[in-house]
């Protein structure tokens, strides 16, 4: 999962990157910046998923918005907030207390707050389904791009993502980093 990407959730192997990549069927994309703050937006219609996304970049936060999420598939559609090597504890705010997440935490509520490696994440909205987890993962960069050596790498990984469900219709999200 790459942060900010809305895609199908699958445990299947990643496709090997070839010379040809399916292109976005929509050409709407743009942004503006004063060098410190900025706004960008794009519409995506690619690989069976449609979504409109925008980002507002400020001095100390990024507001991420998505709307019109839809797909026709039997796979769950997710949007990743974060996936990185674990550096310290992943914490969730519950009833005013920061609690450590040691495995997987899943909740459906109007607001969730997380903290990892000096970065805070806030999700909110109507019944947002959010998953946060710390898990040991193994893989080979060679499986993604064959220019890398075929050796396995193992690491503790922090993942935070929103679940939009199977075959979502007009779903949306909003989160702050």
Language model regions located:
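Short helix/loop capping segments that flank catalytic or ligand/cofactor-binding pockets
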Residues: 89-91, 123-125, 131-134
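Beta-strand-rich recognition/accessory modules
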Residues: 130-177
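Long, contiguous C-terminal modules that act as interaction/assembly or targeting platforms
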Residues: 105, 110, 117-128, 141
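Catalytic and substrate-binding regions of extracellular carbohydrate-active enzymes
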Residues: 1-105, 110, 119
